[in-house]
Amino acid sequence: MMQTNKTTANPLLEIAQRIREMREIVGYTTAEMAEKTEVSEQQYLQYEAGQADFPFTFMHKCALAFGVE
């Protein structure tokens, strides 16, 4: 039986962690990312923590902020 860790068992959390990693790599604060994705900082923090499911528009705006097309 294949073992799974907490991240792979929860794809939402895995994506949220990748968004956080990309934000840290490009050097944006959570406030800057909230502005770039047009959500409140509180909502952004919930998305980044994997505590709330995020819409496609949020993902698209993250990609644009990170320079990914």
Regions found by a protein language model. Name each.
Residues 2-25:
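A short, Lys/Arg-rich alpha-helix, primarily the initiator
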Residues 16, 34-37, 63:
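Small-residue (primarily alanine) positions within well-ordered alpha-helices
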Residues 17, 27-28, 54-57:
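Residue-level signal for the short linker/turn that defines the boundary of a DNA-recognition helix
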Residues 22-25, 50, 65:
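Histidine kinase transmitter module recognition
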Residues 26-49:
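Short alpha-helical DNA-recognition segment
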Residues 57-69:
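DNA major-groove recognition helix of helix-turn-helix/homeodomain DNA-binding modules
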